[in-house]
Amino acid sequence: MRIAVVGAGALGTMHAWHAVARGHEVVHLEREPQARGASVRNFGFVQVGCRAEGEELAAARRGRELWEEIGAAVPGVGFRPCGSLVPVRTDAELAVAKALVGRHDAADRGFALLDADEARTRNPALRGALRAALFAERDAVVEPRRAVRAVQEHLAGSGRYTFLGGREVVEAAGGTLRDDRGERHHADAAVLCTGAWLGGLVRDLAPDLPVRRVRLQMMQTEPLGEDFGTAVADTDTFRFYPGYAGPWTDALNAEQPQHPTAASWGMQTLIVQRADGGLTIGDTHAYDEPFDFDLDEAPYAHLTEVAEALLGRPLPPVRRRWAGVYAQGLDPRPVVQRRRVDDRTWLVTGPGGRGMSCSPSIGETTLDEMGL
């Protein structure tokens, strides 16, 4: 069968991956020359430990398995099974970590509580003060600015994949797409993975779509000059992800309120090392549109302060700063908004911040539901 996929970010590319793997022919359209949205502006952090119990955790675990398989087939993805650490310093933070490793599903999440020496064995670059750390062994990273393009180049070698950049799809019906150059692309089925683009065609097809947009700010440093052995999060991550929530996080919030800057910007601090040695650090979360177009310095100052406290040393110079926008379902329980808009056309959007982690499993499930 011939499958049309719209959107060249991680979500669209993973749908194309599974379609080609199942023997189908794929035409892949992207309105930009190449992906420029959230997939290439994020951490490349494949997170399992923080996911909500049930469907989301299962999707993240399967997504991580698939990323490892894809990384083995496509080295340019840069898959690294490095795990992640959340260093803790206070009694309230330690209580959260202990509660999490005592969960009934802690093994599924790969959780372990490490003492300070064990944590620094995993990541010797952590020279700041810490008492212990929550380790999530199943977490991994990929290279976000390279991964989707590397997968697309690999798919092109199959002889059953065609990428068409600079083509905005303006009409979709019955498996046929019309782009803004007036060309029609006929397929047996079409999957629209348009990311944070929720107007135009998407609004026409699904005007009541329960999805919002979220804006973030991030930065990347020059090379650190040493191996940063794991991904790292500060303890604001306990406040942010539903998979960590419980009486223990309520106690943390009561005993140790979040820093005012972090609270006002919806922040946690995540740090992931890139293949060139630089550190990707973020992020903020803004939910009310219209979004500012400025990059504000207050959250960057907070990120720098937290990162330097974890490292116990100054950060390397900042190489670049940027903002990104992703689509998130208003109801956090479904992993993604998946809607059949006609007999041959499906719309898949709104995975939120779990898009990079879960895209491979989301694509797999979509094709299963389509009977492909």
Specify the residue positions occupied by each region the protein language model found.
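N-terminal Rossmann-like FAD-binding beta1-loop-alpha1 element of flavoenzymes
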Residues: 2-27
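Dinucleotide-binding Rossmann-like beta1-alpha1 core, especially the glycine-rich loop
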Residues: 43-122
